[in-house]
Curated annotation (Swiss-Prot):
Belongs to the GroES chaperonin family. It is found in: Cytoplasm. One of its GO terms (biological process) is chaperone cofactor-dependent protein refolding. HAMAP family: CH10. Gene3D superfamilies: GroES chaperonin. Heptamer of 7 subunits arranged in a ring. Interacts with the chaperonin GroEL. Keywords: Chaperone, Cytoplasm. PROSITE patterns: CHAPERONINS_CPN10. GO terms for cellular component: cytoplasm. The gene is groES. This is Co-chaperonin GroES. GO terms for molecular function: ATP binding; metal ion binding; protein folding chaperone; protein-folding chaperone binding; unfolded protein binding. Together with the chaperonin GroEL, plays an essential role in assisting protein folding. The GroEL-GroES system forms a nano-cage that allows encapsulation of the non-native substrate proteins and provides a physical environment optimized to promote and accelerate protein folding. GroES binds to the apical surface of the GroEL ring, thereby capping the opening of the GroEL channel. SMART domains: Cpn10 (SM00883).
Length: 97
């Protein structure tokens, strides 16, 4: 199944991050907490402005982003993988290498 977001929505695949405890033990999965970083896997066409024009999004497929994991971010399972559906405004930053 494929998924295509509408308007200013994006689909993000959460990236797992490795954390260490105060004692140096590597924490993974639920012990490490949920990451607020992810990879953009699909983008909508853009935000519709009041005058009817479409403003393209600043993010693109493949971007690694830091996002606000709060109200308005929807978690869905697509092909047995968790993805997040959010508005571009829920993205706080693009991580540049």
């Amino acid at each position: 199944m494929s998924i295509r977001p509408l308007h200013d929505r994006v689909i993000v695949k959460r990236k797992e991050v490795e954390s260490k405890s105060a004692g140096g033990i590597v924490l993974t999965g639920s012990a490490a907490g949920k990451s607020t970083r992810g990879e953009i896997i699909a983008v909508g066409k853009g935000r519709i402005l009041d005058n009817g024009t479409v403003q393209p999004l600043d993010v693109k497929v493949g971007d690694i982003v830091i996002f606000n994991d709060g109200y308005g971010v929807k978690s869905e399972k697509i092909d047995n993988e968790e993805v997040l559906i959010m508005s571009e405004s829920d993205i706080l930053a693009i991580v540049e290498a």
